[in-house]
């Protein structure tokens, strides 16, 4: 039997997850992330769930450096990537530009994300 302990995470949320302190930039280095995440074996799994209509809009949450966003955009889909870490988004934007892809990237906390229709 698994014994789980409930932890009060208010300190973490108020100290490290506010808009003034981007914890992701301290934890995640975009170059290291890319070096460690070169495998795209899971791309097939995600592509199976994509709509047949390539005009449909797709939202990728926690897109990081665009590991999945870019290959999906290359398939002709209109995809938007969202991430909270500025360095990850900068890397994703650079990679999209180098690939000649027009992809919208949004820096936001997905817990409070408010998108227009």
How should each PLM-predicted stretch be described?
Residues 115-117:
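A short acidic, Gly/Pro-enriched loop at the edge of an enzyme's catalytic core
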Residues 36, 62, 85:
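Anionic group-transfer/hydrolysis microenvironments
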Residues 69-112:
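Class I SAM-dependent methyltransferase SAM/SAH-binding core
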Residues 4-6, 10-64:
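Conserved class I S-adenosyl-L-methionine
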Residues 44, 65, 71:
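Glycine/alanine-rich phosphate-binding loops at beta-alpha junctions
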